[in-house]
Amino acid sequence: MTDNEKEVMRLLSNRATVRRGFEMLVGLYSEKIYWQVRRIVITHDDANDVVQNAFLKAWLNLDEFENRSKISTWLSRIAINESLDFLRRKQRQSGINTDDEQLIENKIADEYFDGDAIESLLKDAIEQLPDVQRTVFTLRYYEDMKYSDISSIL
């Protein structure tokens, strides 16, 4: 556990400093959580919405964190579950799976998309995976998580 993580845990454990601790927690992990979510839900706007919901859920359930795992693992689990819930809702609302045309439109409109041909092929292949498999793939190969950590998150 890093010094920052220790400080966050110390602040979160005291009612008088819990708000400051959570602000520090958001500062430490928001970018990491954003990119985990972004690789699952694909678009920037959707990722921002899911991340906001994940941190809100973490704040509302802070007293349920039991300190058996790292707080970053707990946050990741919340964010990934929120991402998968978002995709399920989106799929129910559309009534069909996201088709290739929509994926291409998202990629073209994505200001962060690099455009490199190999990266494009890889991104296409990853986007075709079922939600849970895509999540496992991104956590393992983009986040370098161990399978045991991934299984505890999912």
Could you tell me what each predicted segment is?
Residues A16, D116, I126-R134:
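Short helix-coil-helix linker/hinge
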Residues M1-K32, R39, E127, L154:
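N-terminal module of bacterial RNA polymerase sigma factors
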Residues T2-E7, Q93-E119:
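Internal acidic/polar
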Residues W35, D49-L56, S69-N81:
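Structural recognition of an alpha-helix C-terminal capping motif at a helix-to-coil junction
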Residues E64-E66, R77-N97:
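Arg/Lys-rich amphipathic alpha helix in sigma70-family domain 2
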Residues V136-R140:
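A short pre-motif secondary-structure segment
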Residues N14, R39-I42, N53-K70, K90-Q91:
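Sigma70-family region 2
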Residues D45, S148:
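Residues within helix-turn-helix
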